[in-house]
Amino acid sequence: ALEAEVKAANGQRAEGSCFPYPIAYNLIPQIGGFNEMGYSSEEMKMQNEGRKMLHDETIRFACTCVRVPIIRSHSEAITLEFENDITPDKARELLAEAPGVVLCDDPNNGQYPMPLLTSDQDLVYVGRVRRDLSADAASFNRSLTLFCCADQVRKGAATNAVQIAELIFGLK
């Protein structure tokens, strides 16, 4: 749909679109239908699956899922509150050592995660690690904000399935 709309924006005829509005050069803050509280089905899925993956039903999530005009990769701006104090530098150190993660965090020199970097890879790119300025005084030293990107087909589905199978069957 995006490729067809880019052609249309360049004066060529576009085929039918699966989106309710033009997606080329646009953002659509809706993925799926809305519930009575105003959350889309994708937002509810993200909240429910996040708790399930982390094995903690008490974790609170707030998210807005937005359809963006790119072909591959998902991106997330994430704010985290930890039980103990953590500095952005310590978080960067831990992320740099994490398997499957690429720390891409030098914003002053234009180095940060972007979908174009992550497409067709099994890696999660993380950057823009910084203090959460919305945190209150009690949690300020325990709160960070970061940005990450990953290919949702490779890392979000296929690679995760292979990695889980490797763990279950002791293949790695």
PLM features per residue range, with description:
Residues A1-L94:
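Active-site-lining helix/loop region of Rossmann-like oxidoreductase modules
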